[in-house]
């Protein structure tokens, strides 16, 4: 009688645990825009999500601990003139976030430590260079102030945020159609992209050369997403010819055949992959799904091992993924997602069950810290470096806000090109000031109501 051998893995029993109601963000208006990005970005200080807004594009930023019901008059980041499609926190400054929008611009914002008390309309810098909507923004993982944007003009621009200049351009000759996804390698030397022309490319952005390319990694017509994983491999999600969802693992040096190809189900939502290099686990989250699947990647065949699936009743409209330094290591939490419902953002902790509450060194190797390994000039000059690692043994405390230094010469020149008439303020300026006054009045009224209730309580005693 043959006996089935079960592969040993410390992650075999990882389980997902949704947060209690008082630890969720309630009454948020998640964007209805159709676009395959996560719509949510988190770091150890803040949770940000793209929300519905009248008269332009906006997103909400809240301090991570400010859970519960979100006031309808909460101040928003609202400088874009059309819907926001993607947001990304800077990995080297937890107070800086980038946004890409249908208004063809990328904006970089600085959030104060306590969060916003008034609507934020003026970015630190506006990056203009795309001719169609900007659907992807991604920070360089190890070089300071280097930001990538991809637009529906089929162009990828790499920006030096410190100067506001587009320092690298990958034009339509590289991607002849819509770019579905872009991901940096761990050291930032390469990017991998997926495109509507059904090709996945590995590109050296400083040279503008395609170093590897795979035509039709999935036979279906729906969007493919690709991310770098460990040891020179990439993972793709897509659809078969029969519209079955698939996940595949590839060696970038031998793209003829996948190392592993697995069919999952027949749902229609595009799968967004999130890879954790510390544990070699990849999580697949589908927009419109109510589940998160997770797989472990190993260096030996069959390479891609299904671990389990977290399921819930309500479908997800988007998903945020917390960097490792924002997790609770004393609870053996190895990942945390922020699931967007229609009117709620719900944290979901992925946990390894352990009996001891001591620090589990095998679960938490040194991880990427908040300090950049290179300057923008060093990276543009040809240097590469992996992330500077930190230990989580004593926990992680986010540093106080660091000022984002920007040479405003370029941005100021643009603004001077379209000056406002002096003297009487413009109607746009007046309407903004009126809205600020209304928001302040609403805040004062709520504080007064709280004072009245406290006085009644004291008098009753």
From Swiss-Prot:
Residues 403-418 have a biased composition (Basic and acidic residues). Binds actin. The modification Phosphothreonine is found at residue 418. GO terms for cellular component: actin cytoskeleton; actin filament; axon; cell leading edge; cell-cell junction; cortical actin cytoskeleton; early endosome; glutamatergic synapse. Residues 421-430 have a biased composition (Polar residues). Expressed in spleen, lymph nodes, thymus, brain and at very lower levels in lung. Also expressed in cells of the lymphoid/myeloid lineage. Not expressed in Kuffper cells. This is Coronin-1A. GO terms for molecular function: actin filament binding; actin monomer binding; cytoskeletal protein binding; identical protein binding; myosin heavy chain binding; phosphatidylinositol 3-kinase binding; protein homodimerization activity. The modification N-acetylserine is found at residue 2. One of its GO terms (biological process) is cellular response to interleukin-4. Belongs to the WD repeat coronin family. It comes from Mus musculus (Mouse).
């Amino acid at each position: 009688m043959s006996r089935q051998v079960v592969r040993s893995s410390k992650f075999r029993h990882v389980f997902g645990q949704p947060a209690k109601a008082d630890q969720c963000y309630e009454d948020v208006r998640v964007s209805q825009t159709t676009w395959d990005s996560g719509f949510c970005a988190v770091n150890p200080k803040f949770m940000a999500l793209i929300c519905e807004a009248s008269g332009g594009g906006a997103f909400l930023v809240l301090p991570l601990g400010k859970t519960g019901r979100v006031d309808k008059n909460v101040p928003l980041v609202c400088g874009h003139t059309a819907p926001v499609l993607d947001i990304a926190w800077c990995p080297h400054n937890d107070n800086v976030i980038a946004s890409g929008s249908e208004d063809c611009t990328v904006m970089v914002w600085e959030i104060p430590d306590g969060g916003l008390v008034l609507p934020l309309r003026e970015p630190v810098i506006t990056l203009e260079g795309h001719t169609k909507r900007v659907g992807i923004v991604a920070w360089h993982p190890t070089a300071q102030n280097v930001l990538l944007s991809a637009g529906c003009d089929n162009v990828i621009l790499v920006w030096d945020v410190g100067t506001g200049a587009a320092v690298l351009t990958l034009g339509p000759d590289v991607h002849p159609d819509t770019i579905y996804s872009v991901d940096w390698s761990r050291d930032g030397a390469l990017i991998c992209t997926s495109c509507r022309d059904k090709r996945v490319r590995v590109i050296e952005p400083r040279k503008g050369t395609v170093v590897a390319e795979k035509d039709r990694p999935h036979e279906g017509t729906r969007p493919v997403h690709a991310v770098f994983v460990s040891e020179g491999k990439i993972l793709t999600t897509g659809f078969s010819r029969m519209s079955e969802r698939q996940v595949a693992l590839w060696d970038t040096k031998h793209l003829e055949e996948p190392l592993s190809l697995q069919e999952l189900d027949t749902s229609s939502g595009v799968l967004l992959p999130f890879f954790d290099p510390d544990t070699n686990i990849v999580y697949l989250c589908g927009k419109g799904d109510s589940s998160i699947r997770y797989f472990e990647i190993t260096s030996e065949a069959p390479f891609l091992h299904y671990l389990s699936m977290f399921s819930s009743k309500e479908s997800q409209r988007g998903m945020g993924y917390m960097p490792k330094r924002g997790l609770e290591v004393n609870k053996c939490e190895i990942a945390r997602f922020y699931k967007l419902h229609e009117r709620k953002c719900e944290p979901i902790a992925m946990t390894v069950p352990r009996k001891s509450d001591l620090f589990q060194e095998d679960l938490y190797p040194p991880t990427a810290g908040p300090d950049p390994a290179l300057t923008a000039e060093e990276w543009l000059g040809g240097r590469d470096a992996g992330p500077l690692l930190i230990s989580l043994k004593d926990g992680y405390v986010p540093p106080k806000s660091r000022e984002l230094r920007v040479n405003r010469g370029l941005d100021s020149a643009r603004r001077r090109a379209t000056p406002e008439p002096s003297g009487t303020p413009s109607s746009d300026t007046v309407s903004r000031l009126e809205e600020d006054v209304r928001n302040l009045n609403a805040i004062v009224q709520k504080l007064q109501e709280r004072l009245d209730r406290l006085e009644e309580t004291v008098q009753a005693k």
